Amino acid sequence: SSLSVLVLSLSFAYCLSAPVPQDEDSELTPGDLQLAEHYLNRLYSSSSNPVGMLRMKNVNSIETKLKEMQSFFGLEVTGKLNEDTLDIMKQPRCGVPDVGQYNFFPRKLKWPRNNLTYRIVNYTPDLSTSEVDRAIKKALKVWSDVTPLNFTRLRTGTADIMVSFGKKEHGDYYPFDGPDGLLAHAFPPGEKLGGDTHFDDDEMFSTDNKGYNLFVVAAHEFGHALGLDHSRDPGSLMFPVYTYTETSRFVLPDDDVQGIQVLYGPGNRDPHPKHPKTPEKCDPDLSIDAITELRGEKMIFKDRFFWRVHPQMTDAELVLIKSFWPELPNKLDAAYEHPAKDLSYLFRGKKFWALNGYDIVEDYPKKLHELGFPKTLKAIDAAVYNKDTGKTFFFTEDSYWSFDEEARTLDKGFPRLISEDFPGIGEKVDAAYQRNGYLYFFNGALQFEYSIWSQRITRILKTNFVLMC
């Protein structure tokens, strides 16, 4: 068949064989280099391409492929393998290539009709058949909610989207790689394999945050089956790296809505008129939810995300909260660090968590009232620890409390009004942190630099100044 000829031709295609260039400061093992070579050969080389267009001429060098990969993920583009690049390569992900020229098809494809069929060919032993059925149906509904598309299930015969579970070589000349690594792949709209969606049955699929959530993986893959490429937006469902998200309240991100509606247009049954957008760090109107330092690194929280700002970094890195801590909620209210204890505290609603480094401490979350707050208190707006006094200020609405970290009790005489003790910063605080004898209070798009010793505002800055804007 023509597919067999194509696959035979691919066996003679270029394969990475030159050594992978590496950063001199990185301590990489031979296994790391082998992983990187395999990753680039699989996801950034046309020789890995099971279907579509062959590109035998002007095959890019390994250094160029590394640069492409680093650029796609927003890393520092060096063309050399380093720890940050390797960390991305080690994360579980979709098996579809990231860059268009290496993708299954050379141009945008879409289904020529809005009424599509799907069939679940077989099942994973990890879940009951009803759990798989529900996850697949819900994953397709993510896309039909925002488009005119309709999906009808077939029990027999050939459907537009054939859903199956398989291991290693599973019939499409694009084998899976065992546990972790590549979780699934899907083919864009078209005949034969077009639309078909395959899941690696060496993975442990689940309906929660254990293993890999089938709904999350399937919703991503169906994006490919409908014609979408990977997105560079880390908040997008079509970002190639797997991140668990709460499925009960899942709303398709705006980036994905925009992409799918370019292909099929909007629908008229969207239950979520507002779709979450990825924050822009240099937005002049940017406000933040929380800020803290963690072992010298600033962590600035906004919606589902946080920015990492390290003294040695030239730019802020945007990361999903769930990609670091699947156990945490999608949004935080407040955060602060107690450096002497090597602990950071994160707050949401009436609960709070403690971090030692990046690890959540056992026996957390705990309740706010365990710190002495009244049980009627619903949330903390901001928190900041003053290392000179050993006190932590907790801000809520127009008031604040003082907490003695040594005694682990609230100080008497509180709460007090923010406007009386910190005049000029406004009647509420969104976030706060301390640095070099100053408290920094964030209120909407502004931050106020407040001298602890003179007890006055010394500078007013834009909130995005903390993100090097």
UniProtKB/Swiss-Prot annotation:
Binding residue positions for Zn(2+) 2: 94, 220, 224, 230, 238
Residues engaged in binding Ca(2+) 4: 289, 333, 430
InterPro entries in the cross-refs: Hemopexin-like_dom, Hemopexin-like_dom_sf, Hemopexin-like_repeat, Hemopexin_CS, M10A_MMP, MetalloPept_cat_dom_sf, Pept_M10_metallopeptidase, Pept_M10A
SS bond list: 282-469
Signal peptide feature range: 1-17
Annotated region described as Interaction with collagen, given as residue ranges: 266-469
Major localisation: secreted
Annotated propeptide span(s): 18-100
Positions with a binding annotation for Ca(2+) 1: 126, 201, 203
Residues of the active site: 221
Positions with a binding annotation for Ca(2+) 5: 291, 335, 383
Binding site for Ca(2+) 2: 160, 194, 196
SMART domains: HX (SM00120), ZnMc (SM00235)
GO cellular component, one term: extracellular matrix
EC category: hydrolase
UniProt keyword Signal, yes or no: yes
Catalytic activity, EC: 3.4.24.-
Cofactor mode of binding and number, as noted: Can bind about 5 Ca(2+) ions per subunit. Binds 2 Zn(2+) ions per subunit.
Binding site for Zn(2+) 1: 170, 172, 185, 198
Family label: Belongs to the peptidase M10A family.
Protein function: Plays a role in the degradation of extracellular matrix proteins including fibrillar collagen, fibronectin, TNC and ACAN. Cleaves several types of triple helical collagen. May also function by activating or degrading key regulatory proteins. Plays a role in wound healing, tissue remodeling, cartilage degradation, bone development, bone mineralization and ossification.
Record remark: domains: The C-terminal region binds to collagen.
Other facts noted in the record for this chain: The Xenopus genome contains two genes coding for very similar enzymes: MMP-13 and MMP-13A.
PANTHER family, per database record: COLLAGENASE 3, MATRIX METALLOPROTEINASE
Name recorded for this polypeptide: Collagenase 3
Species for this entry: Xenopus laevis
Phylogenetic placement of the source organism: Eukaryota, Metazoa, Chordata, Craniata, Vertebrata
